[in-house]
Structures are given as structure tokens and as C-alpha cells.
């Protein structure tokens, strides 16, 4: 072997060895994924700030991933839709490469439901200039959480070099969101703040256009120059040997490289400048280059670098020169190492000499050490208080104080004092205006013919867990399984005090939609207060919940016939069921009324075979199951009927084993209540499984599913005189007759008549909560709220709960009063659904906010309220009955006994 050949082999081996060694100098973002300190509290509370918070219990310090402090997360004070200006800021104190973020909603041990389905990120390296993070395709929005408890990790491609990071939660409608976060990455030891370079160019090849631009650069672009930012040359991604290929998926040819043609640079070099965070001693610069010389890409012919210590200083001395020569041998991409000789500086200017048609770089990194000279150290970035970062920095003076530099604005103390006084005066004027407004409201109420007691006006968008006022007093309450974050100013673990109903009426955000003019109370003389009614509870603001009294006499002694209103209101308790909100509001029972424990009708769990999940909620799920060998269970213990050859379908409500103690107690109470219901048009409790977890209750389920889906799949027969013969087939599919629709409505009225005799209030009567069995048998159920299919029928109130406002009487929406009369209103809407064959949602032309405003029109009673239109198949007489169901005055609505009698006997005569 000749000497020349041996020398060539040694040179090639040296180049490969140097290239491999130099590759180790480029950081690997895959190894830069350490938690940066939110969860383990390495990041102190003082370095976490927010634009606003709902209360102290949802302040910035509670935003740590997997933390359950306070109310369980950071929750902004206002809605994030549509402006998306609320943010959570984390100060990392030093530059870090952030490669991954984790988010979580507010779970709070099962009490919270708020989370953010998507969010944006902004970041800053100096506290002054903020950049929007974008992925490699220019998208800013990051998908977030689908539930409040799960942690969702998102890779950031490209990663961002930042000291301060802001999370901006997003929503597609007005709703509450809460957030917990963690950042993952590592310390940015390069210290590179920005680089300045010519804009990358496009290479025209015969088969493809190769775009060699810096697509992730986060600085400015002007005059063919990119400056003030970082991009692909500092993202840790090293290009492949063939620059037309890429490490990333779904990107264009040349994505990994930034390149320039020598034809565009008559000087024969590309000049770049690099700015660092502080004064450094530079040992080596490593540049990863492409050398696919068959397509024109060559290594640089040489590199010249100069240094300076400050932005206003001149470049120091002679440049450091390093000749490379541009290899025509090995076409593989490689990292070249440029020795910098230990020069000191904070700014570098490097010129890369062309040795061929193109220069292509994918990564540039530096090996350097920080100079421990405080006089030359670049000061750390200022910390900005919550709010938009200032845009004019000419008047800012940086004063380090301890470990936290602050931005101090030069200003006159007199101006600050005047501003404070103006703010105080405006606040006092606002308080006076609110007091006058409240006083005027009280006068209006006192002048009305029918007095509405303040304690009766618990006027807010009522949720299923709210107090329901019966006989002007709240029913006994259980601690709700879902709790919204405590109001601002309320100390932890204290119950919010409700001063009076008028204040709630005036302060309710939803009610602001309604007060275009002053409302007046309902007209007509009010009924005298029954002598047996207890006085209004004056301790409603105590920290404890009321317990039901233990009467020795019957719960509700019958009053004189002429002393009660048309609809009596009973003492009730509300239960939070498996799915987070049971629909029934039921009478408060004296001890021993239904036994001390759940009925001992233990259903054999092994006989249940899962078919599908009907719905789910906060504390459990509702499953559709089939009972195996049901004929063996036919006995007095299990009220089931089995038809030979037909499977027995049941609905199984399952309580999660980790449910709270309150949820378990409510579950057992619901079992007791359900065991009292025995009516052919109400679903029955067939049995329970309470010996071990998970607790289950088994109820009827009908083979034809819910009434909404059943009717929407059918057409109305043309012959209105068709008898009760059921379904028939036509060319358009199954049909249903008008008499059968009346039969359906009569069965619903019959079931509700039975509930009314027990003083049960359903609160969510709709076709989605009615089940259809054999021969058009209708049974009223209560788990429609848990089904995702009907999520659009419910309105979320400030992230707290969901309400079927399109079916609710105006007094339910505005005053939280649920009575049998409000169920009559919902029955009228349900009957409208039946006659429309469930083709349309009630008030489908109105938004949710307009429906609430329409409830306000009923309250004001100025003739501007909107009613549901008459269905095409509905006779005028029947429509007039429906309008009576929607009477403004609850006592003017027909009772269910009258509704059932009309639909069962008289309705056909009106056709």
C-alpha cells in the first residue's frame, strides 16, 4: 500500500472520528426532558404569576401539576372566551430549553370539573419581548385535556428557549377553565440568546424545489436578514446526509437545513452574528454541514470569527481564522469543529467562506464557559407583574433586589396618589349606585300586589344541587359532590354566606341579561301562609347544612282546603346521583319512613352481562346490561316480567369505588327513594348490589330505547283517525299515528300524576328521559343528563352544572324554584316534542342566552315573551292546553290529573 493511499485513509479516519466526537457537542433534545420544578416545588410560588384568579384558593400557587392544594388548580377570574387573555406565567429564572409541557384540569378529589381542551403558549427570554410558540407547520393551538384529572403531555416541536413561559387556556364558548401545569426540559447551557443570518434560500433541482429557509425562526425578518431570535440552527435537530430528506414527518424537502447560494453573495462568504446571555470564554464552535457535493452542497472553505464584549463596542483585534478547504471526498453530512482559542466576548461575528455553489447548515453550537466577572455579566431579565408586558422600556430602570429583579417605572408620586384617589372615588360611586339600585328594586317588590319574600328570591341560574325553596324555606342540604371554586374573599373551608335573595338576583351574572328594564313580581293575590308552615330559616348563612327536622306527627299535615295554593310545595331534599346530579327532588322523609337501610333485595351481580355504556358522570356510570337466565329470578323479590325468547334489558347505575362518602350516602338514599316508586309509567328499582364495591342499582330498561330517538326515526301517518295499532311501515320507513302520540302523552302525564301525589319533582322531564317498551309502553326515567348524545340540550352555568333550560319554567331558571307546577311546564314542552316527532329542539332558533332572556320576559310580563309554536299535527284545543302549561303564574297551570284525563279521554274528540 502506497504512502499516499495510507495518508488518505488516515485523513478519512480522522475526519470521521472528529465528526463523531463533534456530534457529541450538539445537545440532544430527546435527552432534555427533565421536570423543571412545578410539581416538586423547585420553582417557588413567587416565580408563578397569573393575569387573574377566581379566588385565593385558585391562585397561581395552586397551578402545580398533580397538586391538590387550595381548590385544586389555578382558575382565572373571568371567561377565557373569546379574548383568550387570561394566562399563567412561570419564571424559570435562567434560560432553559423547554421540550415538553404537561397540563391537567381541576379535579380536587372529584369535586372539580373544569379543564382546558386547548391552550396557547407564549415565551420570553428577557421579559420584554414575547413570542408565540408555533409548531413546525405554523399552528399555535395545542390540544389539551379531555377530563379534569388526567395529565396530558405534549412534545414541543420545535422546542423553545425561554426563561418565562405563559399558558393561555382557550375555550370555544363562555365557560370556566382551570389549569395545572409542568414544564420539562433542561438548562440552556449554550447561553445563546439570538443569531442574525441572511434569510435561507430555495434550491431549484430538476425533480423538486428544495426550500432551505429557517422556518422556525422566532425573531424578526427585514431586508433579507433575520435577527433577534433563534430557529432551526439551535433546535438540536441534525440534518441527514441527503438534504432532500428530513428527520421530521410531513415536511418539505430541505426542511432540516438552512442554505445559501454563492451566487447571491459576491463577497464569497455568509456572515452571521451570535448574541449570548453573558460574557463567556469560547473554546469551540461546532457547525453541522451538508456535503452532498453532487448536488452542489459543500463544506465551508474556511471560517473567520471576531468577538466583542458589548453591543456598543467595536470588534476586537484580528479575527480567528480556520481553514477547512471544502471536502470533495466523503459526501456524508458532518459536524466541523472550529477552535476559537479561548477568546472572551458576548457577541460573535463569523464569516463562512464558500467552497462550492451552496452552504447548508443544520445546527450551530458552542463550547464555552461563563466569565465570573459581575461587571461584564449580562443582567438577568426583569420580572413583570401580571398584566400585559410593557412596550415602552425607555423609562424603565432595572434594580436588582435580593434574588428577584423588578422593573421600576419612573413616575411622580403625586401622579400615583391622584390615580389612587380617582380609583377610590370611582369605587365608592359604584357602591352607591349599586345600593340605590338595590333600594329601588326592594321598593318595586314591596309595592307589588303579590309580595315575593326576599328569602324566596334565591334568584340565580339554579343548578340541581342548589337550594330549592319550599314554603319559603330551604330544604335540608347535603354537601354537593361538585363544588365550584370558592368566591373571591371567602376563606378556605368556609361556606359562602347568601345574604338575601334580592342581592343574589341583582348580582347574578346571567340575570344581567334580563334587567333591560325593572321587573315586577307576579301578579295576582298570593295565597295566605298556611298555619302549619314553619317560618323562614334565618340561619341560612351558617357554616353547617340544615338537617331535616324529626317530626313526631306526619310530615305534612293536611291544611284546610282553602288555605293552600293550587300547587302545594313540599319539604324536599335533593340528591347528587351517580352521574353527578340526580334529577328527582324528593320529599324529606322522617326517620324510619322507608327503613334504616337500603332494601335487602340483592341482585346477583354475576347475572349481569354488559352490552354498552349509556352515560357517565362524576361519580359513576350507567350501563345497559342483559340479565342472564332471567326466568330463574322471577319471584316476589324481583318485580320483573320475562317473555320467552326475549332478553331482559336493565339499566345499571354503578358508583365508582373511589366516590366520596357524600356520594355513597346519596347513592343509598336514592336507592331508598327509588324503592318507593311503584307505577307502570315509572321505571322500577329491580334490585341492588351493595354487599361490596362497586355499589350498583338495577332498574328497568325498555327494548325500544328512549322516546326521543324512537320518535325521530318515524313519520306521522296521514290518517289522523288511525287507532292505537302501533307502528306501520311505509316507503319512508316506520310511521306512527296521531292517536298513538296522544297515548304516549297520556302515559307520561299518568306517570307524572303519580309522582305529584308523592310530592316528587322530576326537574328534567323530556322525551330523552322517557323509555319506550313493548306496545308503546312509556316509562319515565332520569339518566338522560348523563348521555353525551344529549349534551346539547343542557346549558352549563359558569362551569358548575348543566341545566335543561329549554324545558325549564321561568321561575326555575331565575329563582331556583322547582315544584310540581314547574314539572307541568316541562310536560308541555315534552308534549310539544312528541307532537313534533322530536324533529326540533325546543326554541331551536334561540341561543341559550336568548332562552334565559326569554325567561326574563316571562318575569317582566310585558307581552314580549316567546312561546313554542303550534306543531303541524296539533289541534288548536290541544295547543291551548299546552299554552296553559306555560302560564306565567304557577297556580294557573293545569294539574297532571287534568292533563291525563284530557289526553286519555277528550283529546281525540278535538281532531
Curated annotation (Swiss-Prot):
Following inactivation of the gene, the phenotype reported is: Mice are born at the expected Mendelian rate, but female mice are dwarfs and most of them are unable to bear offspring, due to defects in blastocyte implantation in the uterus. About one fifth can bear offspring, but for these the mammary gland fails to undergo proper differentiation during pregnancy, with hyperproliferation and abnormal branching of the mammary ducts, leading to a lactation defect. In addition, mice exhibit hearing loss, due to alterations of the inner ear. Mice display poor calcification of the fibula.
**Superkingdom per UniProt:** Eukaryota
Where's the active site on this chain?
764 (proton acceptor)
Q: Which residues lie on this side of the membrane: Cytoplasmic?
A: 437-911
The UniProt record lists the EC number as: 2.7.10.1
EC top class, as a word: transferase
Q: Which UniProt keywords apply?
A: ATP-binding, Calcium, Cell membrane, Disulfide bond, Glycoprotein, Kinase, Lactation, Membrane, Metal-binding, Nucleotide-binding, Phosphoprotein, Pregnancy, Receptor, Signal, Transferase, Transmembrane, Transmembrane helix, Tyrosine-protein kinase
Phosphoprotein among the record's keywords? yes
What segment(s) does the record annotate as region DS-like domain? 193-369
The entry marks the following residues as binding Ca(2+) 2, namely 232, 235, 237, 362-363
What's a BP term from Gene Ontology annotated to this protein? mammary gland alveolus development
Residues assigned to the Extracellular compartment are 22-415
The record's listing under Gene3D superfamilies reads: 2.60.120.1190, Galactose-binding domain-like, Phosphorylase Kinase, domain 1, Transferase(Phosphotransferase) domain 1
F5/8 type C domain sequence ranges:
32-186
Span-the-membrane segments of this chain are: 416-436
Q: What is the designated name of this protein?
A: Epithelial discoidin domain-containing receptor 1
Q: Which organism is it from?
A: Mus musculus (Mouse)
Higher taxonomy = Eukaryota, Metazoa, Chordata, Craniata, Vertebrata
